[in-house]
């Protein structure tokens, strides 16, 4: 989730005022307290990524109500909030940008950029196993699920064939990283490694 103490943790770093800092939010409501905290250190973020409910991976919504939200509305809410508060911070639309037409619509509505990730999982440059790339390429809507098996405890969107599903993984995460079990293992990573071992012939 959004760590409200991020600026406090970084404020003593020599590059605190030089390096670009961006945050990811899923609502204007989540943005408000972060900006309030950041203003204390005279260091607002350089850009804001607004991630919608159709993003791959972790979601900033509840497991039961993510379908009630849409990226266009959230981006507009954030843009209105920034304008009302006279904050000139670039906004990046993410999570549900499927086509060039989508990208143009967001840019024309006021976003400074768009973020596209899942589309590139099937490219040659992507390091996923070839079998997994084919799963992405051939997936239809029914092959995509939202669940709470992530070690973070947050809802996440994944393919139904994910090796994490059915592996017995339970939420066990703290703010600063995954908790290891008594033997020093991370269940999430172990599930991934098992998948690699079972499908070595498909890894390029």
Describe the role of every protein-language-model region.
Residues 45, 55-75, 79-90, 98-204:
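Conserved active-site-proximal phosphate/metal-binding subdomains
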Residues 1-85:
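Active-site entrance/lid segments in N-terminal catalytic domains of soluble metabolic enzymes
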């Amino acid at each position: 989730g959004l760590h409200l103490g991020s600026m406090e943790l970084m404020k003593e770093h020599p590059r605190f005022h030089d390096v670009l800092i961006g945050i990811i939010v899923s609502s204007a409501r989540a943005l408000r307290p972060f900006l309030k905290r950041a203003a204390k250190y005279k260091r607002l973020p350089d850009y804001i990524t607004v991630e919608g409910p159709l993003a791959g991976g972790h979601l900033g919504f509840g497991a039961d109500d993510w379908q009630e939200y849409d990226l266009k509305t959230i981006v507009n809410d954030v843009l209105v909030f920034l304008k009302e508060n006279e904050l000139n911070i670039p906004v990046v639309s993410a999570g549900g940008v499927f086509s060039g037409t989508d990208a143009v619509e967001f840019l024309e509505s006021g976003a400074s950029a768009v973020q596209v990730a899942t589309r590139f999982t099937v490219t040659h440059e992507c390091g996923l196993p070839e079998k997994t790339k084919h799963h992405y390429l051939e997936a239809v809507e029914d092959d995509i699920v939202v669940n709470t098996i992530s070690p973070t405890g947050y809802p996440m969107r994944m393919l139904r064939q994910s090796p994490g599903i059915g592996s017995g993984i339970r939420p066990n995460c703290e703010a600063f990283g995954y908790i290891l079990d008594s033997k020093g293992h991370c269940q999430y990573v172990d599930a991934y490694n098992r998948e690699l071992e079972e499908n070595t012939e498909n890894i390029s």
